[in-house]
Amino acid sequence: MRTSKYLLSTLKETPNDAEVVSHQLMLRAGMIRRLASGLYTWLPTGLRVLRKVENIVRQEIDNAGAIETLMPVVQPFELWEETGRSEKMGPELLRFTDRHVRPFVLSPTAEEVITSLVRNEVSSYKQLPLNLYQIQTKFRDERRPRFGVMRAREFCMMDAYSFDIDKEGLQKSYDAMHDAYCKAFDRMGLEYRPVLADSGAIGGSGSQEFHVLAESGEDLIAFSTESDYAANIEKAEAVAPTAERAAPTQEMTTVDTPNAKTIAELVEQHGIAIEKTVKTLFVKASDDVDADIIALIIRGDHELNEVKAENLPQVASPLEMADEAQLRDLIGAGAGSLGPVGLELPFIVDRSVAVMSDFGTGANIDGKHFFGVNWDRDVQLGQVEDLRNVVEGDPSPCGKGTLQLKRGIEVGHIFQLGTAYSEAMNCGVLDANGKNVILEMGCYGIGVSRVVASAIEQNNDEYGIVWPEAIAPFTVAIVPMNMHKSERVKEAAEKLYAELTAMGIEVLFDDRKERPGVMFKDIELIGIPHTIVIGDRSMDEGNFEYKNRRANTKEAVEMANIVEHIKAQLS
């Protein structure tokens, strides 16, 4: 590709509204342009990368036995009513009506559509197992689109759906897709981790996320120092302490704390160790509980895991914190002074709190706390659950090593849906005995456009993008110095360009009438792995200059050997 016949829309300055590195560099490298909030046009350079990611994903998913199809972006609303997800998805599901006032949605995912297709097309166990996938545009009406294509409203996604006669078959399909994901991300040259995850709005049982490790990642992932265990922060289990609860050494006393409305203020003003405090959080109770709200009690230095809390049968979904008015009406005190002692509402205690003794907690009176509180003496312990986020150094749930925390960007997710959708939509087949069996489903997604941004977050330097070779927009750049003034430079560049392209190598030939400094900066910004600089001075010595983008090195290579040198770099 010649730059004179290409849309090379690089920018010198970083746009003010670009927060993360990938967004900044995608704009500066001329990969994308914003059309509206969360909507982006992919320019030629960006599209080349996107297509490479797509093709790697397609090849590995094909190799796993899946079959490509293509489903509409517009879906009938009635399908979403069949599964009950029309309400669960909330405002992210964009709804509209056509000219006949028939309701439709823009596809955020395609479980309903694919299940409808399979129930009409597949009738016998002999047609199974079946795994269908597509690479298609999706739309989710994000409340706050940000970070460029990392969290856009419209995005490109590979979504696959497997159908099996039993759970054993589902496990095989799931494992095959897990392996396909690993092969795809390995080929892309990404540092990633598959982690245990919560199934969320998709539903089902077992699930794993695939995270590209990056400091800018929105998600925290926990992994063992001595095993393959890894989970996202929502799923990671906080193991129950093995030590028994110490015997009380203090009597419970009431302490005036008029200026301590937070744990931090309590610790600072009254000298109590934060590990000896508990905080009591109130959330809306489910319909099964004989109370409007329920208390969740965690240690003062820990954070509530909202997903774990929402998964408790006593807690309403979605999770909703009680407001100040509710607390004052039901308890008579504000949020900073609440605790379990004397509380006439149900409460659930975190595992770490269950082994505490002589701790401090709110007295359910404004401006007062109890110190020296002990379970079973001052208040009955009751139900104990895992309520908190894990922290660095916690024991690993696998029993090996401790947990480390790193930030990651979720680029893929695989689910064992079971019969959650197939039962709701009556998707079954006749088995070998002629009996109707509801199908076991799996679903699998890769955020193709998000992979592009994630790769940049992981691969960049002060000069621009440093692409893994497999997904770079071009493999080699040819930069001829003053070719419009030097005939031999032009001839050498044209000859080399013809040779490399004939070999199937993707080359960007910078034939612009630009200053060398501008050309070099653009090539580095775009992140092309290999650059060949052709100039009169080096040719006088019989050489071309070769630059390796990732190693940030350059060397003189004999003109006659340059093609073999490039071939060696690519092998």
From Swiss-Prot:
It is found in: Cytoplasm. GO terms for biological process: prolyl-tRNA aminoacylation. One of its GO terms (cellular component) is cytosol. Its main location: cytoplasm. The keyword Ligase applies. Transmembrane segments: none annotated. GO terms for molecular function: aminoacyl-tRNA deacylase activity; ATP binding; proline-tRNA ligase activity. Keywords: Aminoacyl-tRNA synthetase, ATP-binding, Cytoplasm, Ligase, Nucleotide-binding, Protein biosynthesis. Pfam families: HGTP_anticodon, tRNA-synt_2b, tRNA_edit. Consists of three domains: the N-terminal catalytic domain, the editing domain and the C-terminal anticodon-binding domain. Homodimer. This is Proline--tRNA ligase. It comes from Aliivibrio fischeri (strain MJ11). The lineage of its organism: Bacteria, Pseudomonadati, Pseudomonadota, Gammaproteobacteria, Vibrionales.
